[in-house]
Regions:
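Conserved NTPase motor "head" modules and their coupling/switch loops across ABC/AAA+ ATPases, GTPases
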Residues: 9-140, 149-153, 157-160, 164-166
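Short, intrinsically disordered, charge-balanced linker/junction segments flanking boundaries
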Residues: 4, 166-168
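Walker B catalytic acidic pair
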Residues: 144-146
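Phosphate/Mg2+-binding loops and adjacent switch elements
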Residues: 1-10
Length: 168
């Protein structure tokens, strides 16, 4: 918003260094926390997905930061002029992404619809596990006709996995 407002209020340009410093400081923290979270998530999701697919698929979540945390300050500085022209901030944790690979293949691009749905379900089950462990309470799981999209072995695994979770 600041980059857009600078053209209406030129005095705001003088505050850009302060905002960039804060974005870099907090951005580095966010990037590090996301890295740790994805590592933890992978430990859980790989087991869930392996069981859900009957051992035929290995799922891995890959955190793709727009730039490494240690390079964030340099990248923000190098991109400043272009970012001011474009009125966007092109680097930082708001530009990060997650990739999901099944057996080493990026399923965003090359996965079947079934693989994508199964990976999404594995992600949901992993989230439930992490939330349950973190807050020491069982979350509610909302599923919309998911069983019709799964074969019988995946249905059985899903139902066994969520038997103690309130579902809607």
């Amino acid at each position: 918003k600041l980059l857009k407002d600078m053209y209406v209020q030129p005095g705001l340009k003088g505050t850009l260094d302060i905002w960039d410093m804060q974005m870099v400081e907090y951005g580095r923290r966010i990037i590090e926390k996301r890295k740790r979270f994805v590592e933890e998530l992978n430990e859980i999701i790989q087991n869930i997905h392996f069981n859900l697919t009957g051992g035929t698929e290995n799922l891995r979540v890959i955190y793709e930061p727009s730039c490494p945390g240690q390079e964030l300050e340099k990248t923000v500085s190098e991109n400043r002029e272009r970012d001011m022209r474009m009125k966007i901030t092109s680097a930082g944790p708001h530009r990060d992404d997650l990739c999901m690979e099944v057996n080493g293949i990026d399923i965003r691009r090359y996965g079947s619809q079934g693989q994508q749905r199964t990976a999404a379900l594995s992600l949901k089950l992993s989230e439930i596990y992490i939330v349950k462990r973190t807050i020491k309470d069982t979350p509610v799981l909302l599923l919309d006709d998911v069983l019709s999209e799964l074969d019988s072995s995946r249905q059985t695994y899903l139902l066994d996995s969520i038997h103690d979770i309130q579902t809607m």
